[in-house]
């Protein structure tokens, strides 16, 4: 989400020159997994990333690229999937996608149609592996069961909402992932910046202007504050930043393969990479976790193309 033309929803994104600089530094630091979507920046995120890779990456095998499909007029119909993969490949200037993720569950088309179409992409070598995002456990199990029944490619990863102040995935999803031999690439691992600073610190543009993230976290700020205070305590104790501690916590979880973290400043990228110098003790982790109380589940119900929840009284 950090790359692409500025939009009303995400006005803080990086232009092409800034994208080049950010990706160049990321590659220098050893980062090789990049996540985007056909809808980010109205498609320009894929374009900017593709342009940067063309200039900076000598061997395509040195990077792992994930992109997503769902937000289009056909959602996850076979026709829409076949059309959208061609658009993503063109914008990214690539012959294949390493990890192709369905961005949401499609309540309007049979999962059999979706999984068959995705399997055809794998067979045609336009996609190497399949992932999913923002799904309930029953949906993931249904999708993989359908694929298994027909001998089709299954999902190997899920990109769900998970961080130190939102741990509802620990109820059922993580146990299912263990059984399915899948991994997580959690989105919002830093809770849109809420676990990177104390509430009275300077507020970033995203914290104040991102309506979706305000709805996700603002209602729970009172029950989250004690945890955020403990993050600050641990950070001060081990001479780290709060962001590093929060990311170290999520990286301590065995099924987390790669948290999805976005940056708008190279200094943020460099600081976060220092997380690999940090190791939280078992006592630190227990101290950070023991105050957690159940949260209202961020819904993943049927949504319209303009991303409005059909249950407006819930948070999206």
Map each language-model feature to its residues.
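Terminal-tail/helix-coil boundary detector
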Residues: 179, 203-237, 252-256, 266, ...
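Conserved beta-strand positions
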Residues: 36, 67, 99-102, 132, ...
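Short, well-ordered coil/turn segments that N-cap beta-strands
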Residues: 30-32, 59-63, 94-98, 124-128, ...
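Glycine/proline-rich, positively charged
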Residues: 7, 72-168, 172
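N-terminal binding-site loop/beta-alpha segment at the start of enzyme catalytic domains
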Residues: 1-63, 95, 123, 191
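Aromatic-lined glycan-binding groove of carbohydrate-active enzymes
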Residues: 168-206, 241
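Active-site-proximal loop/turn and secondary-structure-junction residues that shape catalytic pockets
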Residues: 2, 38-40, 69-73, 103-106, ...
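Conserved, mostly hydrophobic/aromatic
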Residues: 19, 34, 49, 65, ...
């Amino acid at each position: 989400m950090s790359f692409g033309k500025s939009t009303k929803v995400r006005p803080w994104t990086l232009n092409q020159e800034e994208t080049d600089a950010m990706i160049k530094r990321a590659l220098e630091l050893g980062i090789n997994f990049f996540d985007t979507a056909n809808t980010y920046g109205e498609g320009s995120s894929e374009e900017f990333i593709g342009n940067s890779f063309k200039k900076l990456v000598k061997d395509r095998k040195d990077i792992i690229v994930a992109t997503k499909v769902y937000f289009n007029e056909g959602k996850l119909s076979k026709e829409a999937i076949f059309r959208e993969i061609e658009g993503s490949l063109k914008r990214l200037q690539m012959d294949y996608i390493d990890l192709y993720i369905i961005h949401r569950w499609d309540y309007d088309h049979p999962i059999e149609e979706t999984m068959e179409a995705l399997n055809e992409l794998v067979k045609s070598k336009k996609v190497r592996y399949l992932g999913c995002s923002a799904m309930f456990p029953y949906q993931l199990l249904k999708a993989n069961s359908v694929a298994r029944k027909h001998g089709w490619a299954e999902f190997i990863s899920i990109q769900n909402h998970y961080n130190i102040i939102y741990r509802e995935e620990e109820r059922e999803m993580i146990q299912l992932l263990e059984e399915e031999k899948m991994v997580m690439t959690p989105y919002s691992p830093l809770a849109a910046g809420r676990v990177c600073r104390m509430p009275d610190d300077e507020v970033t543009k995203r914290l104040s202007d991102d309506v979706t993230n305000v709805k996700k976290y603002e209602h729970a700020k009172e029950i989250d504050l004690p945890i955020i205070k403990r993050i600050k305590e641990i950070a001060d104790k081990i001479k780290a930043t709060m962001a590093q501690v929060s990311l170290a916590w999520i990286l301590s979880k065995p099924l987390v393969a790669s948290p999805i973290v976005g940056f708008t400043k190279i200094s943020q990228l460099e600081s976060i990479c220092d997380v690999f110098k940090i190791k939280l003790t078992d006592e630190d982790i227990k101290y950070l976790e023991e105050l957690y109380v159940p949260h209202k589940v961020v819904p993943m119900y049927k949504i319209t193309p303009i991303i409005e929840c059909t249950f407006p009284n819930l948070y999206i």
